[in-house]
Amino acid sequence: NEKSKPQTETASHQENHRHQPTETIKLNNGKKWKVDENMMMHIRNMEKDVAVFKKFEFSDYKSLAEKLKQNIGLLTSNCTMKGKAHDELHKWLLPYIDLVNKLAKSKNETEGEALFQTLQHSFITFNQYFQ
């Protein structure tokens, strides 16, 4: 079934890295890591969705989370990176995926807002280490 293939790839891609504890991202000898263009497109789409997000009601957080999950699926199913840059990206990506999943399951506006602010900050971190 072609339709479920990206979901399966996404799940297996995440599972392969889930056992690693959250680690501190390191620069590439003082420089930012280069992210492949096709992957960066999905990251920038998510960053834009977070930057332009306006909450009018609690359900908007869940809508944002679903939108972000779609881009995470596209990002992970199109993963072409290898080596140290790939490993460093995962140090950012796995906690980010966890945040999005928590936002999707948030139970109230206070929790949703706190998670949203953490998501905003995650892109500041991303831009410190990746280009």
Model regions and ranges:
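Charged, amphipathic alpha-helical oligomerization/scaffolding segments
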Residues: 38-41, 45, 63, 67-70, ...
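Short, solvent-exposed, charged loop/turn and helix-capping segments
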Residues: 72-90
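Short flexible/disordered coil segments
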Residues: 13, 17, 76, 81, ...
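Non-transmembrane, amphipathic alpha-helical segments
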Residues: 27-38, 53-60, 81, 88, ...
